[in-house]
Amino acid sequence: AKIEQIVGWLKGVYADKPAVIAVSGGVDSAVALTLLVLALGKDKVIPICLPYGKQDMADARLIIEFNELKDKMIEINIEAVVEEMARLVVAEEGSVRKGNIMARTRMIVVFDLAKKLGAMVCGTENKSEHHLGYFTRFGDAASDVEPIAGLYKTEVWEMAKILGIPEIFYTKEPSAGLWEGQTDEAEMGFSYKDADLVL
């Protein structure tokens, strides 16, 4: 029922406009992308991959192929922009500041492409991240539409299973994809399962 509810809501919000969505290879963007395709159809959804340097985008490509959107994918490497910005403001490698610069650079690219394509930006924020403050203001939290903002992380995993999304998306460790080996739970110091029990 929750899926139908979100899909119906997305149809109403987007009307005839296309959607752009940054696809990272994590479960949040996988679920949001799949819901968008169910709501708007493949013709109206443009997935955007924004790797940093040699960042592995295999899972992002996997969910894009799962939704049969390979031909519509836009890929832009953000490394040069991030490095220049980090150099200008002297943000250290692996720091929260550098991570924020990455998230905000992705936001700039996604909103610019939305403007170019006459589209609305679909976000991938979940309720757990929001309550925990685990996001970058004006970065990954910036969007026009947030289809999974009402779902806790544990509910996002459940929805991924129901949608038939490949298992890798709900079995791997969640990561914001900011640097090598970075995981949400290591940064927060607790698991989403534990957090959701409290939230």
Regions found by a protein language model. Give the residues of each.
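ATP-dependent adenylation/nucleotidyltransferase module used to activate substrates
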Residues: 1-132
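Short alpha-helical "packing" element that flanks the helix-turn-helix/winged-helix DNA-binding module
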Residues: 194-199
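Catalytic subdomain that performs nucleotidyl-dependent activation
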Residues: 65, 97-106, 119-191
